[in-house]
Amino acid sequence: MQNQRIRIRLKGFDHRLIDQSTAEIVETAKRTGAQVRGPIPLPTRKERYTILTSPHVNKDARDQYELRTHKRLVDIVEPTEKTVDALMRLDLAAGVDVQISLG
């Protein structure tokens, strides 16, 4: 796998789970002899929702909710076959969305 690059994007609502999963990926890649760039924190997406608490009157009574989506990026430069096998066997947390692309 010469001149290859694996780009891993992690997404989730809990930043602690993402950091833990990122640390596992980086540790696994370094242990198998690959060169790692990252983790790079990407901008957090904040979605805000405002909801009226009363069904009919009292427009001033509102609740506000926020949903934060945290993202991290890890680049693995020049991965070995052992690196790819170890990453495929890696079991990450359930609350983390992982996207892997080869470049």
Swiss-Prot record:
**The keyword Transmembrane helix appears for this protein:** no
Q: Name one GO biological process term.
A: translation
Q: What is the protein named?
A: Small ribosomal subunit protein uS10
Which InterPro entries does the entry mention? Ribosomal_uS10 (IPR001848), Ribosomal_uS10_CS (IPR018268), Ribosomal_uS10_dom (IPR027486), Ribosomal_uS10_dom_sf (IPR036838)
In the record, the note on similarity to other proteins reads:
Belongs to the universal ribosomal protein uS10 family.
Q: What does this protein do?
A: Involved in the binding of tRNA to the ribosomes.
Cellular component per GO? ribonucleoprotein complex; ribosome
HAMAP family linked: Ribosomal_uS10
Gene symbol here is: rpsJ
* A Pfam family reported for this protein in Swiss-Prot or TrEMBL: Ribosomal_S10
- Source species, domain of life: Bacteria
Subunit: Part of the 30S ribosomal subunit.
Q: Which GO terms describe its molecular function?
A: structural constituent of ribosome; tRNA binding
Q: Which UniProt keywords apply?
A: Ribonucleoprotein, Ribosomal protein
